[in-house]
C-alpha cells in the first residue's frame, strides 16, 4: 500500500482508475494510504490552494469511492462535475480499495477517517505515543458516529539487532502489548540487500 499518497495532487478519475487497475493486477492486495501533506510548495506546483487541501482530499476520495463501486456515475461539487462515467476496471476488493487515512488526532482528519477510512496511519505525536494516540483516535471517530472497532491501525515495529543480525525474539516482544492496545498492522524498516539471494536469506526469519 501507499504510505502516504497525497491524493489531492492527482486528478480523481485518473487516480481511481490507476488504483483499481493495480488492485486487479495484484489480485486485490492494494491499500490506499492518503494524507493532506505539509509542503505548501507541492500544492502551488500543481496549481492548487494549500489552504483547502483537506477539502480537496475529501472530494478526491468521494470520486474514487463512487467510480469503484457504481456503473453509471455522476458527481457534482464545487471542485468537479461529471456525468455518466463508466469506469473500468473495478477493484477486486468490494466495495472498493481500502483507504487508510494518515494524520494526527484532530477534528478534520478524524472526521475524514470516520467517513472514508478502513485504517488509520498515525502521524506526529500520535505515532510517537501510539498507545495514547489509538485511544484518542477511537474516542474521536466514535464521536463522529463510526464504530472504532472497524478501523485498523498501523504501528511502527522497531527492529532489535545484535551486530548485523536481527534478533527476532527481541523484536517481537512488544507486539502483544501493541495488539492489546488496538494496533492491527505493523510496519518496519529493514536495510534489504540488493541481490535477490542475499535478500531472501536475510528476510527468511522475518
Name what the model sees in each region.
Residues 1-206:
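Active-site-adjacent structural elements that line small-molecule/cofactor binding pockets in enzymes
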Amino acid at each position: 500500500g501507499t504510505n502516504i499518497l497525497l491524493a489531492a495532487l492527482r486528478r480523481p478519475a485518473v487516480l481511481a482508475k490507476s488504483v483499481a487497475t493495480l488492485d486487479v493486477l495484484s489480485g486485490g492486495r492494494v491499500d490506499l494510504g492518503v494524507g493532506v501533506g505539509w509542503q505548501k510548495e507541492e500544492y502551488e506546483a500543481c496549481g492548487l490552494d494549500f489552504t483547502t487541501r483537506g477539502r480537496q482530499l475529501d472530494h478526491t476520495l468521494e470520486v474514487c469511492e463512487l467510480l469503484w463501486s457504481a456503473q453509471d456515475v455522476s458527481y457534482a461539487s464545487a471542485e468537479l462535475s461529471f456525468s455518466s462515467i463508466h469506469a473500468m476496471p473495478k477493484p477486486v476488493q468490494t466495495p472498493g480499495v481500502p483507504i487508510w487515512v494518515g494524520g494526527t488526532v484532530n477534528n478534520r482528519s478524524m472526521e475524514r477517517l470516520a467517513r472514508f477510512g478502513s485504517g488509520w496511519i498515525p502521524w506526529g505525536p500520535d505515532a510517537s505515543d501510539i498507545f495514547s494516540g489509538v485511544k484518542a483516535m477511537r474516542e474521536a471517530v466514535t464521536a463522529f458516529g463510526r464504530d472504532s472497532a472497524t478501523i485498523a491501525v498501523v504501528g511502527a515495529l522497531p527492529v532489535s539487532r545484535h551486530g548485523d543480525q536481527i534478533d527476532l525474539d527481541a523484536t517481537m516482544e512488544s507486539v502483544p502489548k501493541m495488539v492489546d492496545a488496538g494496533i492491527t498492522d505493523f510496519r518496519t524498516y529493514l536495510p534489504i540487500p540488493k541481490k535477490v539471494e542475499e535478500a531472501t536469506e536475510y528476510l527468511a526469519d522475518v
